[in-house]
Amino acid sequence: MTKPRLKIIPLGGLNEIGKNMMLMEYENDIIVIDAGHMFPEEEMLGIDLVIPDISYLLERRGKIRGIIITHGHDDHTGALPYILPQLNVPVYCTRLTKGLISVKLKEHKALSEASLKTIPPGGKFTLGKFRIEFFPVCHSIPDAVGLVINTPIGTIVHSGDFKVDYTPVSGKPTDLSRLAQLGTKGVLLLMADSTYAELAGYTPSEQVVGENLDNVMANAPGRVIITTFSSLISRIQQVIDAAAKHQRRVFIVGRSMMNTTQMALKLGYLNDPKGILARLDQLKGMPRNRIVFVTTGSQGEPTSALVRMANRDHRQLHILHGDTVVISATPVPGNEGLINRTIDNLFKQGARVLYSKLAQVHVHGHASQEELKLLLNLVKPKFFMPIHGEYRHLSLHAKLAQSVGIPEGNIFVLEDGDILELNPEAGKVTGKITSGNVYVDGLSVGDIGSVVLRNRRMLSRDGIVVVIITINKQTGKLMGRPDIVSRGFVDTREAKDMLEESRDLVARTLDHSGARPTEWSLVNTKVKDVLNKFYYEQTKRRPMVLPFMVQV
């Protein structure tokens, strides 16, 4: 009889940044690790977010014992409002992570039905045949954890997002002693964060950012505007501390930033002992050199507070000449264009802008190469699987693992949807499941597919031509010349002759086709074909051609 194997299947987070989601399956038990979203790429027109395809989980809903969240960043929690109502399983996380998830679920009116279980760092719990332990890791957010997962075939360590920082601003350092203990007992598989596997050396401490923010507030002649991710609680604390030192008041701007700040204050993860935080209605009459704004918009999101300020579109606040704007975040891949446009607009408004290329106003929360090697040497896993990163990150992390003595045959560089099957002696990729992207477009989730995106790209690039064909209902004959309406294709005044010629071309095509009204599909195809060819010959463009038939 074949012994059961442990299946490990990534649903997101491999060969991409964000959308982190992993499942483990043993016999009739499944646990899910993280459920994040990622930002759309530039060609994903009109898409707000991208989340993992959970078809595999929906087909096995009865086997899912829970979702485990390693920390509160959106790339690990952002899919929960969309998938929890479908799966209806409990979520296990630390206290701050629960608070951040609650804010997100409340915004989507999904909180009342959710079951959120709080587990402290160091806590242990059992889900089916899996025994899970949270161990503290240092990241750019408090209450981040890695996972020790005891399975019937051996111990698995999941690093979560981590770095080695001995002087964290808030939260605990990564528990290296626990990792060393695990290494002496024996670890079957290590899955570790690869986001910054390209960078040599060590990741700088978060203290560096605090020192630079302090310097900015000491020297800025006017208002200071700081933008970061709303979930970067430790960064917001650094702003409050620096503002208090320099007699400035802090105003929180942006709905998500406000909600997160209020939650973190309530739970005790943010401290404001000197009453530095203020409301916008207290702003009037305050000297500019006593003002700090903390706002959303670090990724150039079009509807964020900072972008609206940069475009002079914010209802309450505008950029003033002499403002200092600090972008305390690095661009998520795909958002570079949005951020650069925002920076340009801020400069145009007369602001001084500080960002990663000009000042160290942000450090990332991920381990660099020496920290990754330290983790590998402490844990001493039999097998290794790099996670969280694009292919180059995973590949470089795999090379690091080889450099510390893990055999190449024991290292698994997977893609989303790959099925890795493990037993105590060996592991191999045995197949692939349906995985990929589900697009969130406003209120629509999952009904935007590749065809819709292709059409949007076509419209944005080459425009649209609508052909209105009037047909006699009785005879099926064309009545007059077709009308052609163009948008985003050509200047109708300059291309008047070409559009007139295309009207004649459609009329001749229909006269020769002999199509009856019942043969509209044939008419539709013929009109599209002839106009696509004609317009490409004339302009080297391929507008979307939409024929409409009106029967009178």
Question: What is each of the regions a protein language model found here?
Answer:
Residues 90, 385, 544-547:
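Short glycine-rich phosphate-binding loop at a beta-alpha junction
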Residues 105, 401, 535:
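Conserved hydrophobic residues forming the short capping helix/wall of the S-adenosyl-L-methionine
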